[in-house]
Amino acid sequence: MSRILFYGLLLICIFLGFFFYKQKENNIIYNRIVEKFEDNVVIDEIYTHLFKDSNLKELVFIKSQLIIPELEHKKMIKATGYRADAYKALSTVYRFDFKVHDNKILGFKSVIFEGFEDAKVSKHENNLPSEKWQQLKDFNIGDPNINEKFFHLEFPFVVKNTLCVTISKGFFKKIKKLKRLKIMLISNEDREYKIDIENFLPKYNL
């Protein structure tokens, strides 16, 4: 009996080891979060790439899907107007979050995707009404000066800055074709943070 229990525990350990290996394959940590409110569903698929040797600690890619059964009806899919158009624009949203640690609050005035230096960039706040997202060309980096009054301060602890970059469906399709993701962030202090990693996006059903 004890031998059967031992082999059973061993198989469980092997399975868990393989599971966590697959979850962290190529430095990518995968999470899936499903939230329900009333009859609606929000599904977030989150892919996190960890960095070890710089102030840039994480690159996080998030695909968010909003499912509203009422608007999924065939008649609504073909409909026009503010509500229908907003839902079409927001039902699937793609976003990169860049997490930078420093002893200061940072702003980021520029984001450059190598190969797409001429991309059309907007700089409006991420919480603006949905009609802004319908006008999204390539990607939005938010207002770089939203915390400007704090830029001069230095803190005796680590400040975890997050830059959220929302990208359009069309631009997502373009960067998905790249072999490598080469991205440069430029802060309000003209500090450059460079990323050069294998493009993990084509490996997943996004």
From Swiss-Prot:
InterPro entries reported for this sequence: BptA (IPR031471)
Cellular compartments per GO CC: cell outer membrane
Leader sequence segment: 1-19
Recorded coiled-coil stretches: none
Keywords: Cell outer membrane, Membrane, Signal, Virulence
Subcellular location: Cell outer membrane
NCBIfam families given in the database record: VirAssocBptA
Job of this protein: Virulence-associated protein essential for survival of the bacterium within the tick host and therefore within the natural life cycle of the Lyme disease spirochete.
Family: Belongs to the BptA family.
Protein name: Protein BptA
UniProt organism field: Borreliella afzelii
